[in-house]
Amino acid sequence: MTEETHPDDDSYIVRVKAVVMTRDDSSGGWFPQEGGGISRVGVCKVMHPEGNGRSGFLIHGERQKDKLVVLECYVRKDLVYTKANPTFHHWKVDNRKFGLTFQSPADARAFDRGVRKAIEDLIEGSTTSSSTIHNEAELGDDDVFTTATDSSSNSSQKREPNTRTISSPTSCEHRRIYTLDPYPMDLYHPDQRLPRSYPQVTFPEDDEEIVRINPREKIWMTGYEDYRHAPVRGKYLDSTEDADSYVRFAKGEVPKHEYTYPYVDSSDFGFGEDPKGNVIKTQPPRAKSRRRKENGERSRCVYCRDMFNHEENRRGHCQDAPDAVRTCIRRVSCMWCADSMLYHCMSDPEGDYTDPCSCDTSDEKFCLRWMALIALSFLAPCMCCYLPLRACHHCGVMCRCCGGKHKAAA
């Protein structure tokens, strides 16, 4: 890119990490722009290039490793945006084509919402919109794509002698951990051996539960975990190895030790008896190796990569999750015939085509597509059952009787 502009960080309405792609019409494929590499791509509000005093929107991409501007494209009302797949979107302005390969479907959806928001503001003529497209209902705790620093910048934590601050990888809320020492050092001499104790750690906001951790491994959690990596907290808290320390999660006071030891009557021990026969073989129960799902706990879905609440997770909440009813409807109604016809006859150079039953009148092939579907229904009459079955399925999704459910990542 010859002309470089550096918009203010506050002017972005959405910003994600992606690989900028360029279209090669000679070979009919997409290739990385300027040698590839992860770039910070966002939609920001800038002054209109024509200098008429009005504001416009610019899609700005800057490669991370060398700060090279690899993408600059002004958003226009006639911008044609295509979602080829969940992680690759491309658009066309005049005769120029741009594409982005996102790192996750959540990034792609956030960028799509940002572009649509910019186009709506241009159509309405109001570019003073200060509302951001992010809200807690659509995005999770980790889906904040505005100017946020990487997790590596927050990984340094100050070590204190008695108080440490850590944060959960699924939340930015910080908590204090207080280590209670039941044996003060002032009461013992240096040469006196201290009795062995188990340090008690209290998390005031979590439910009461005993889990094991390995004290030989130092765990330092950062304040902002990358959602593409497995959570560190679940890795260490689910360990079943024997440990010398116990961590207790409690709301109030720390209860007493829950281990119960069997009582043996003193009459069983006599002179001349074999002491091996009186060995107590009962062992204390082991702590649970799996944490139960707490009330209001949020996890990330493996299908759509969005955060969800386990208590509110019902059918129809995840559009990307497998839906057996929807798959059965498409097979019974032979919709694969319509998909094959549209792919071979009405697809664009990238192989994308409109949904067979779409009612979008802005499509150039709207009338031709429906006429072809009507003609095809005479050869496959079962296609006429698709619309009624799809309407029933939609009602079932609204009633939470069918549809896909979120699935927590392991």
UniProtKB/Swiss-Prot annotation:
> Domain SPR: where?
300-408
User: Which residue intervals define the domain KBD in the entry?
Assistant: 197-252
Q: Which UniProt keywords apply?
A: Cell membrane, Cytoplasm, Cytoplasmic vesicle, Membrane, Phosphoprotein, Ubl conjugation
Q: Which GO terms describe its molecular function?
A: protein kinase binding; protein serine/threonine kinase inhibitor activity; stem cell factor receptor binding
Query: Where does it live in the cell?
Result: Cell membrane; Cytoplasmic vesicle, Secretory vesicle membrane; Cytoplasm
Q: What is known about what this protein does?
A: Negatively regulates Ras signaling pathways and downstream activation of MAP kinases. Recruits and translocates NF1 to the cell membrane, thereby enabling NF1-dependent hydrolysis of active GTP-bound Ras to inactive GDP-bound Ras. Inhibits fibroblast growth factor (FGF)-induced retinal lens fiber differentiation, probably by inhibiting FGF-mediated phosphorylation of ERK1/2. Inhibits TGFB-induced epithelial-to-mesenchymal transition in lens epithelial cells.
Q: What is this protein called?
A: Sprouty-related, EVH1 domain-containing protein 2
